[in-house]
Design a protein with these regions (language model features):
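Hydrophobic alpha-helical membrane segments
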Residues: 1-242
């Protein structure tokens, strides 16, 4: 069963190549259906879900190791906030698993891996580059904000001296960073919530996919906002134990 929020099918058109879908109206009930469908797919193919999730976890650990090795522990703050921006690209394999389950196609490692690697000749690398550039730009912006507000305090290790974040400057910095970070997240959400599944499902160019994705968001703003909040809550629940 496809995700009724993000797949091209829910935008009102049948599956066919080279057709950019027009957005259809959806309701918040689609969110519950999407979560139920995702859980159902995970139960049917848990090994695939765990493997692709492991890549995401290992990526986070790698960024943490880089920050600690460089002696720049404060990098962990923008990394924790910005790393989820890479999640849409990390989900490519999961989209393919769900598509195969829906279509009744064979589900084995070679076939899934083959499809994922074959994306190098389509629009996925372009979307990945956009996502990566946004992540890198976010890290740069976060670094700039930190330097502007903390000044010479930037030499302080915020992981061992968190009290500097509770000062007037620290709280203002966190507030501004949160607002700007939310802007990055909103832009990326608008681009990928429909765009990424669309370029996987059909032969469309990146610009058309992004435009169609934003059209779907603007056609259903409340539903998409609710969906984004659900994603954020699940994300924070995953980060909280850290």
């Amino acid at each position: 069963m496809p995700d009724p929020v993000v797949t091209p099918v829910t935008m009102g058109l049948p599956r066919s190549p080279d057709v950019v879908p027009e957005p259809a109206s959806i309701t918040t009930s689609a969110i519950g259906s999407a979560l139920a469908a995702g859980w159902c797919d995970f139960r049917r193919a848990p090994a695939f879900g765990l493997l692709f999730s492991a890549f995401y976890v290992l990526g986070g650990l790698a960024l943490t190791a880089v920050a600690l090795a460089a002696g720049q522990e404060w990098w962990l703050i923008p990394f924790v906030v910005g790393f989820p921006l890479l999640a849409p690209f990390a989900a490519v394999g999961l989209y393919e698993v769900s598509r195969r389950l829906e279509a009744g196609e064979p589900l084995d490692w070679p076939s899934v891996a083959g499809v994922v690697f074959a994306q190098k000749d389509r629009q996925i690398p372009s979307m990945a580059m956009v996502i990566l550039l946004m992540f890198m730009f976010w890290v740069f912006v976060a670094h700039t904000i930190f330097a502007v507000f903390m000044g010479i305090q930037s030499l302080t290790n915020v992981t061992t001296s968190p009290e500097i974040l509770l000062t007037g400057r620290g709280l203002t910095m966190l507030a501004l960073g949160t607002v700007i970070g939310a802007g990055f997240a909103a832009a990326l959400f608008g681009m990928t919530v429909g765009g990424l599944p669309l370029i996987l499902d059909r032969e469309v160019d990146l610009a058309s996919a992004i435009i169609a994705s934003f059209d779907a968001v603007t056609a259903n703003p409340l539903v998409m906002l609710a969906w984004a909040l659900v994603i954020a809550l699940i994300l924070f629940a995953g980060i909280a134990p850290l």
